[in-house]
Amino acid sequence: PELSQHTAADVAATFSGLLQQHGITVEAEPAAHAAPQGANPIASVSSATLSEILAFMLRHSDNTLAEEFGRLTALARSENNSPEGATKAVRTVLGNLKIDINGLTMADCSGLSPGSQLTVRTLAAVQQRNLTVGDGAPAAEGLSVAGLVGSARKRYTSDDVAGLLRVKTGSLDT
């Protein structure tokens, strides 16, 4: 299905059509209106915050969410909502933060596409910023914790290190 840009109107039109298919007369066209004063909601939607979703993405190495965050970055930077727009936007943001991106090659935002490369220097600079700048805390806190949680839960499980290391899991190609 195509992504709706006007979900309330689309739902109302679909509902109206279904009512008519079942012999119920609908006398007016769906239209947007403010709820009457004192009206009680009939439904609501809630979600985790973007910070919580980011932490989940990092902790569980969720590649689909990584791509989504790339696309959100692209849209926020007025780039195309595409893999190319996402990687361009991420590189621009990193550059604006004065993070060394020499040697960074992004074929996508998840790292799944062939050709993506990340230097230790770039990764360390991103994590350093996350640990020292207030708005980076969710990214730092979202990393897997060795021996405890996330994709590193079954790694480094000895008492000497379990719970002490926040790590980004994945594979490195040398």
Model-inferred region functions:
Residues 129, 150-153:
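Short, highly charged low-complexity linear segments
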Residues 35-36, 93, 147-151, 159-164:
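A generic short-segment signal for beta-strand/edge and adjacent turn/coil regions
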Residues 40-46, 154-174:
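Short, Gly/Ser/Thr-enriched beta-strand-loop segments that form substrate-interacting elements
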Residues 106, 143, 165:
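Short clusters of hydrophobic/aromatic residues that line enzyme substrate/ligand-binding pockets
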